[in-house]
């Protein structure tokens, strides 16, 4: 019986899963929005929320914990600066998952996972400038 086994294997080894989620959480904080499969987005959400909570704590130990997981020091700086300020008054629910349909090649359910304050017009203006 499979009772009380949480988490999905996603057809990968445990080390591959860990590496994939580290890359995905780094990309999420860097771009504030990523497109992935619905299952990966659902597994990524609690990891991202814990990282944002570390950013809101803001002490040295929390920064080192985030650096041990997130792959880029610049992204950690953004997490502890911009993103932590953005969610300072929010208790949780920092990310949003939007289902977008299916992928053409293999019919996989696709979703967008984004930070709650994400605004497309602001993101487009920052990439153009």
From Swiss-Prot:
The keyword Ribonucleoprotein applies. It comes from the Bacteria. It holds the Pfam family Ribosomal_L17. The keyword Ribonucleoprotein applies. Keywords: Ribonucleoprotein, Ribosomal protein. One of its GO terms (molecular function) is structural constituent of ribosome. InterPro entries: Ribosomal_bL17, Ribosomal_bL17_CS, Ribosomal_bL17_sf. GO terms for cellular component: cytosolic large ribosomal subunit. One of its GO terms (biological process) is translation. NCBIfam families: L17. Belongs to the bacterial ribosomal protein bL17 family. Part of the 50S ribosomal subunit. Contacts protein L32. This is Large ribosomal subunit protein bL17.
């Amino acid at each position: 019986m499979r009772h009380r086994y949480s988490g999905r294997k996603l057809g990968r080894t445990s080390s591959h899963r860990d590496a994939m989620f580290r890359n995905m959480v780094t990309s999420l904080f860097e771009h504030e929005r990523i497109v992935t499969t619905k299952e990966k987005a659902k597994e990524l959400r609690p990891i991202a929320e814990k990282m944002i909570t570390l950013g809101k704590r803001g002490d040295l130990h929390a920064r080192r914990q985030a650096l041990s997981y997130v792959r880029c020091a610049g992204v950690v700086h953004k997490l502890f600066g911009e993103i932590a300020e953005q969610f300072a008054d929010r208790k949780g629910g920092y990310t949003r998952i939007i289902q977008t349909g299916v992928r053409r090649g293999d019919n996989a359910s696709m979703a967008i996972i984004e930070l709650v304050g994400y605004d497309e017009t602001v993101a487009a203006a920052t990439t153009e400038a």
